[in-house]
Amino acid sequence: MTVDKIIIGAGLYGLYAAQKCGAAGQRVLVLERDPAPFMRATYINQARVHMGYHYPRSYSTAIKSAHYFQRFCRDYDFCLHTSFDQIYATSAHFSWTNAAEFRRFCAAAKIRCDDVAPERYFNNGMCDGAFLTTEYTYDAQVLKNWFLEQLAKLPNVQVLYSHKPDKIEKVGSVWRVTAGDTTMEAPFILNATYAGVNDIHAMLGLPPFKIKYEKCEIILCTVDERLKNTGITVMDG
């Protein structure tokens, strides 16, 4: 099988790229190791639509996040949850960012940062600042279904699930990818695997990115009525 582009990973970035390339008339093949799309970082790690508040030590990243926040909200407003108060707070203990620094950072990045009393949400002495911000979450299942509907309209785009690349090699001017019993070739490969980026780099003979991996747990619980429609993030780094 020969296509114009092989995309590895059927998360948000992979399906976005597939939809854009497919709409431009390119033949696209998406390889996904899981039995369905959006099963990893897109669902587990990225439900927040970032405005940039997470990056007080990188103004450039924060500014880029704010820019793409507006774009994401414009393009995918149908999957957003916006009707809640998003509170950011700075830990009073073991944090590299205190309340004064967070205020300066938000002012420099030109993103909303309205002071609220920390005691409204936290025990006394736990946080030295709390702020009402503008940041949203999205429903990954709604967004996934939208992308699948768009891709279904493009006969030149194919997604193969449960297909983890076993081997990638350069053959002349194209890349040959083997995944199980399937072999495909393309002059262009997009690695959209996120946490699995170094697995693909190893197959390509490229040096690995110096990435620190941390386990992530999603805790589902029923909250007190006073915390309904409130999102809370504590900055302790």
What label would you give each PLM region?
Residues Y16, T182-G237:
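Flavin-dependent oxidoreductases
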